[in-house]
Structure formats: structure tokens, C-alpha cells
Amino acid sequence: MQQNNGNAKDEYQTDNGYYCQKWVSKYDTYNRTTDQITYNRWCFPYMRLAELYLSYAEADFEYSGTLSTASLSYLNKVRERCGLPTFADSWAKAGGIPSGEKLREILHDERSIELAMEGRRFHDMRRWKIAHTEMMR
């Protein structure tokens, strides 16, 4: 969908209107007159603290079959950062925190959502041994 003068050089939006701004510095600028982009140098995180928290919760679940108090605390830190209710509060409306395979799926979803656009999904699917089904959808 083009909403400018028809010149592709002046196009400033994506096909669907959504644009991922994860890892884009708010100080980066684009000058349309000179067609110059000014990038701000910054350190790209190889691993975020949220990934460590999610990995801990997942490992704790795989080891014990349930979530410990520490795991719930770490999940809540990740959710609190983006303004979501706590894990227990979210699942209280559905009858409480699930267990077993359903909890595993929920932890996978939490990880997929938090780490979206970071290049982790394929390796997670291989680690979870679901790549052969997920990639064939």
C-alpha cells in the first residue's frame, strides 16, 4: 500500500504497516532530503537477563515438573517489565497455573513472545524437538 507520491525512494512504511523496532536506537535518524542514515553506536546484547530468567524457569520445570517459587519470581520479573500481571494472576482466571504438558507449552510461548525477533526461535524449536512439526505448518 503506497501512501506517498508513488516514488519507491520516498516509501517509509512496510507492506502491512507493522515495523519491528527492537534493537533500533531511538537516536538513529534518517534524512529524507539527502537519503542519509545516521546510526548511533551501541552495544548489542548477546544474551539478555530476561532470557536467563526464562531459561531458569524452563530448566526448573523440566527437572521437577513444576515451577518453584524462584522460577515464578523470575517469570514475574520478565512480565512486570512490560506491564503484564503476574504469572499466577494471569492464570487464576483460567483456574490456576496448569501443570504437565500445558505448562511446558506456556513456558515455550512466554519465551517465544519475549525473545521475538532475536533469532532464538529456531534453536529453541530444535532444543525442544518440535522443529520437524513446527517448520512444516
What do the predicted segments below correspond to?
Residues 1-137:
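Acidic/polar-rich alpha-helix caps and helix-coil junctions
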